[in-house]
Amino acid sequence: MTSVLQIALLALIAVSFALVVGVPVVFATPNGWSENKGIVFSGLSLWLVLVFAVGIFNSFVI
């Protein structure tokens, strides 16, 4: 179970980094928001699922 937690945490860190870099780039480009709105919302949804998954997996490890 520890390895599942570590993989989920690594995925959370990677998605967080991608969103921190990607969202300002999307807002800075002309027509970026209207063209990439779905990608941003998909990333945010994945981030939210990973936050809950890490919390649930953490309760099993400790």
Curated annotation (Swiss-Prot):
Pfam families per record: Ycf9
Just give the chief location class: plastid
Q: Does the keyword Plastid apply?
A: yes
List GO BP terms, alphabetically.
photosynthesis; photosystem II stabilization
Write out the entry's keywords from A to Z.
Chloroplast, Membrane, Photosynthesis, Photosystem II, Plastid, Reaction center, Thylakoid, Transmembrane, Transmembrane helix
Q: Name one GO cellular component term.
A: photosystem II reaction center
Topology term for the membrane = Multi-pass membrane protein
**Which residue ranges run through the membrane?**
8-28, 41-61
Task: Quote the subcellular location field of this record.
Answer: Plastid, Chloroplast thylakoid membrane
In terms of InterPro entries, this protein maps to: PSII_PsbZ, PSII_PsbZ_sf
Described purpose of this protein according to its UniProt entry: May control the interaction of photosystem II (PSII) cores with the light-harvesting antenna, regulates electron flow through the 2 photosystem reaction centers. PSII is a light-driven water plastoquinone oxidoreductase, using light energy to abstract electrons from H(2)O, generating a proton gradient subsequently used for ATP formation.
What family is this?
Answer: Belongs to the PsbZ family.
Q: Kindly state the subunit structure of this protein.
A: PSII is composed of 1 copy each of membrane proteins PsbA, PsbB, PsbC, PsbD, PsbE, PsbF, PsbH, PsbI, PsbJ, PsbK, PsbL, PsbM, PsbT, PsbY, PsbZ, Psb30/Ycf12, at least 3 peripheral proteins of the oxygen-evolving complex and a large number of cofactors. It forms dimeric complexes.
Q: What is this protein called?
A: Photosystem II reaction center protein Z
Q: Organism, per UniProt?
A: Tetradesmus obliquus (Green alga)
